[in-house]
Design a protein with these regions (language model features):
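Amphipathic, hydrophobic secondary-structure cores in small proteins
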Residues: 8-69
Length: 69
């Protein structure tokens, strides 16, 4: 796999992560607005959303070139 292929794979993965993060945000809002949820269910969704945020951060950093100042 070339560097360009790796970059493209990272970009695709980043798009997938952002989509899943956005979908979880919508799901959490819908769950809260429904008023019919338990706290454990909500906590699991929020934890998953935080994990995705970390993966997004790591993937974005992997896409940035290393610049030595």
């Amino acid at each position: 796999m070339t560097v360009i292929d790796e970059q493209e794979a990272l970009k695709r993965r980043l798009a997938e992560l952002k989509t899943e993060h956005r979908d979880l945000d919508i799901a959490i809002d819908a769950l809260i607005n429904s008023g019919n949820y338990n706290n454990l269910q909500l906590q699991r969704l929020k934890k998953r959303k935080l994990v995705l945020k970390d993966y997004i951060f790591l993937t974005e950093n992997a896409l940035l070139p290393d610049i030595i100042a």
